């Protein structure tokens, strides 16, 4: 993904238009950072890749929901990441219904 100029162009356009970008695992460090798309935003990501980021961009949070950037640490956080995206796109009520239907306990939606 990091080598894809098509993806890079799409992400740069997304950022320029002020639209949301979401990335999980190594993607913040190996895709977004080299493209200059992080700005001064904190990002979570897979711990082994976080050291590639500037100190200002690093956080140890499992899930980081910023104004226009959502990042997650890795595969173990995938459900939290998905529910955070669902909440942004469809709202808390719909996301709570979804989490309950999927038997997801302890999510930020049904806490």
Pin down the residues of each PLM region.
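Active-site-adjacent pocket-lining segments in enzyme domains
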Residues: 1-111
């Amino acid at each position: 993904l990091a080598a894809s100029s098509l993806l890079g162009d799409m992400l740069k356009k997304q950022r320029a238009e002020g639209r949301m970008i979401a990335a999980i695992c190594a993607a913040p460090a190996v895709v977004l950072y080299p493209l200059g798309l992080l700005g001064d935003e904190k990002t979570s990501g897979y711990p082994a890749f976080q050291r590639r980021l500037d100190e200002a961009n690093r956080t140890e949070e499992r899930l980081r929901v910023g104004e226009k950037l959502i990042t997650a640490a890795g595969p173990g956080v995938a459900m939290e990441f998905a529910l955070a995206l669902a909440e942004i796109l469809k709202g808390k009520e719909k996301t709570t219904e979804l989490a309950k239907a999927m038997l997801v306990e302890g999510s930020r939606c049904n806490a």
